[in-house]
Amino acid sequence: MAATRVQPSTREIFTTLEYGPVPESHACALAWLDTHNRLLGHHVNGMWLKPEHRNPAPCQDPITGENLASCLQAEAEDIAAAVEAAKIAFKAWSQLPGAARGQHLTRLAKVVQKHQRLLWTLESLVTGRAVREVRDGDVPLAQQLLQYHAVQAHAQGDALADWQPVGVIGLILPTPFSFLDMMWRVCPALAMGCTVVALVPPAFPTPLLLAQLAGELGSFPGILNVVCGPASLGPVLASQPGVQKVAFCGAVEEGRVLRRTLAGRGAELGLALGTESLLLLTDSADVDSAVEGVVDAVWSDRSLGGLRLLIQESVWDEAMRRLQARMAQIRSGRGLDGAVDMGARGAAARDLAQSFVDEAQSQGGQVFQAGDVPSSSPFFSPALVSGLPPAAPCAQAEVPWPVVMASPFRTVKEALALANGTPRGGSASVWSERLGQALELGYGLQVGTVWINAHGLRDPAVPTGGCKESGSSWHGGPDGLYEYLQPLGTPSQESFLCENINYDTFGLAASSILPSGPETGPSPAPPYGLFVGGRFQSPGTQSSRPIQDSSGKVSSYVAEGGAKDIRGAVEAAHQAAPGWGAQSPRARAGLLWALAAALERRKPVLTSQLERHGAAPTVAKTEVELSVRRLQTWGTRVQDQGQTLQVTGLRGPVLRLREPLGVLAVVCPDEWPLLAFVSLLAPALAHGNAVVLVPSGACPLLALEVCQDIAPLFPAGLVSVVTGDRDHLTRCLALHQDVQALWYFGSAQGSQFVEWASAGNLKSVWVNRGFPRAWDVEVQGAGQELSLHAARTKALWLPMGD
């Protein structure tokens, strides 16, 4: 690995033709630090806050170890003050017309442009990243983000008239982050009328500079507040009264801890976890271009994480040879040197990479590193790991920066199996000169972003996110706007925390079933079975639950489902999901309309059932009619789910795909037993999901009646309905590791447990927090909110050019 040369002789320059140093002066960054006497505090409500009796943390140059400044670490009262300032600012900021907010963001973009040299110099100095990446990439993109979201704020009054801002946003950023990560989240939040409190590590002062620039605009100083502190303060910020949403980007385990901490506290949680990306190199690819893609992905200071590299066997030897030769030409050095490719990230990043490499070698992997770096050096040579057995722990672990872990594959099917076999689903690139093969891989990858013959392209108009353990939050494009909006009229999110809940015992066992009185029929009513795998069957518990009518008499029995039945339903759903997701929107629409027609024919039976359970005749008739209409509505909407082209600043289209979540579990509310069941089932099926439902506990018979029409129409296993103790079934679904998403409409305790238990595989959850929902109202029963929760977005980049 070539290192930066210091004052070479003229003869050496003409002999070696190596790059010379191109140092960028950091005088402006030091001057800014000097204006604060090298002691930084927090920026709250447009002012610098330097409270007494706070522990200072050093801000150091990661290359030299020089102490650049000290930053006071926040305590709980500092965070409370920042949240209070954001709450006060929200009252005025959210009431502004979108055009006024857009003008404010435009002014901020001009201020950022005015001070861009200070921004890129300070960012490179304190992070160690190559200055050319910050100067030519991050800072211009930050300006584009402000300008794009200024335009979106102008259009909010028309396009998003039925939505309102969430409120105060708590933003938690990890230690290895760039200020651009903050801008991706701050810009849409401010554009939509929210205010922000950001908790950032004390070693990275660039967010404080951004907050200062925003505060210098004068008006609305409290819309962006930045406090510095350790990661342990994240739960403190997340738990503050008044914080309506928490956006967190960081490590997977930290995300799990935060998910459990926030359970029942009312705040929404958006997670963007992990930094690893994926690159697929096929035998039809331009190998040299793909090698440069690897460099861009992990060794050019654009990415914060490592790379998982899959190479087709027929080009394995050639690709590895060219990659190793390219590694020898990578220049690492001081980030402020404009001629370096890769800077240093500090001792923590170096030690993490060294630990991973050592562990991979101990598990049978082969490691190639270009150049020798002393153990005391802050730099870590680019590392290429290969030959790991598939069962090795490192083969499944997240790859850290700047490590590339290479594995071979034979066929496209095997490549997809290897790529989708990890719990992470962030971003990936596919390198192939055959468009059909590239699209097959791009559509098949379970990730949030796919680039074809490119890597790391970004544009404010294109959504970026992930799936699985990479989190389910989005930034950029229209999806990023909805992260900070909620349907108009939604009340403020208040804590519904149940202090006495025991997570270990909640729903652990079903309630005992005892004789409950005489039956209303002339003969014992036959019990309904569970609807699993396309047919009715007996439960694993071999017991039934009595269902009482409005007079308190037993009208029928339903099966008492348990963990075994949930397991069977989820397995059946996984078998049916691929085929249903591959169906065309027209085919899915036709089946939804057919189910609506079947319910129309069954209208007298369904109305009679509702009346027996206490519904007035007019209400029962209305509920059935609305249920039929909901199926027809989603049958119409499903045909509008095709791919949409996204306009970017680059040549070539970007496809915005809406893909199914996979297996979606739904716990239905007790109220509106037919309408709520259909209103939740229809959008889930329309977006290509396989569904496991727990119907109304008070009146599950309506859902089972609908299943009689589902059986002949839909593939076996696509829809399963399991009856029984709701808390017990909820526990089984929430803890199931093969359920990709869970909607829960029940008690506050159940909502809290679902949020807590979802941390296991970080499934996306949607809970009602114990509050009823007006299913008979179009906005709540068939609104866009259901569509947003029923599918995930994938951005597929198709850039053009050589």
Curated annotation (Swiss-Prot):
InterPro entries, alphabetized: Ald_DH/histidinol_DH (IPR016161), Ald_DH_C (IPR016163), Ald_DH_N (IPR016162), Aldehyde_DH (IPR011408), Aldehyde_DH_dom (IPR015590)
SUPFAM superfamilies associated with the record: ALDH-like
Domain of life (superkingdom): Eukaryota
GO molecular function: oxidoreductase activity, acting on the aldehyde or oxo group of donors, NAD or NADP as acceptor
Quaternary structure, from the entry: Interacts with SPG21.
Family (UniProt): Belongs to the aldehyde dehydrogenase family.
Protein name: Aldehyde dehydrogenase family 16 member A1
Organism: Mus musculus
Taxonomic lineage of the native organism: Eukaryota, Metazoa, Chordata, Craniata, Vertebrata
